[in-house]
Amino acid sequence: MNTKIRTDLILGSKRFSNYAWCFILMTGGIGFCLTGVGSYFNLHTILFVKFSDINFIPQGIVMMFYGTIAILFSLFLMYSIFTDVGGGYNKYDKEKKEIEIFRLGYNKKNKQMLLKYNFRDIKSIKIELKDDINPKREIYLVTKNKNQIPLTRIGEPLLLSDVENQAIELANFLNIPIEGI
């Protein structure tokens, strides 16, 4: 292992929860659209649903509308997963005394984001912990001009011990202090 370079991979949209939501939305959307179409054509049954009991106006139209919206959200989520939005890496290079933060984006204009910082521009590592209904456990790189650059992935919160260990390892590697513990 190279002791002069440290690279942390960041998981983007290719998370299990995104795959699950994509499947749920697509399945539900197709079901709702089939129900709306079945009520329009007065089909008797598809998948154990009796469409003759559902009036096309207003119930069938609403079902088709919600089904279409669900399918569109599912397609958007598929695109996000395919392009791995938010994925990237954090690279800390002691030889060049440089930090690279790379992330993938959505559109062509901001498809890739690469931030480079010199070691001399870095003030500290900051840990932010918030335990509410939606817990927040993040590690930030704090620059001397007070910018806070998030280093952890977005999504499921990490364990408290993992956050602390990552922050301590990184602070020791960069020889800078930690704030917020």
Curated annotation (Swiss-Prot):
Principal location listed in the UniProt entry: plastid
InterPro entries with a match to the protein in the record: PSI_Ycf4_assembly
Pfam short name (any one): Ycf4
Keyword field: Chloroplast, Membrane, Photosynthesis, Plastid, Thylakoid, Transmembrane, Transmembrane helix
Organism: Guillardia theta
Function: Seems to be required for the assembly of the photosystem I complex.
Subcellular location: Plastid, Chloroplast thylakoid membrane
High-level lineage: Eukaryota, Cryptophyceae, Pyrenomonadales, Geminigeraceae, Guillardia
GO cellular component labels: chloroplast thylakoid membrane; photosystem I
Membrane spanning residue stretches: 19-41, 61-83
Protein name (Swiss-Prot/TrEMBL): Photosystem I assembly protein Ycf4
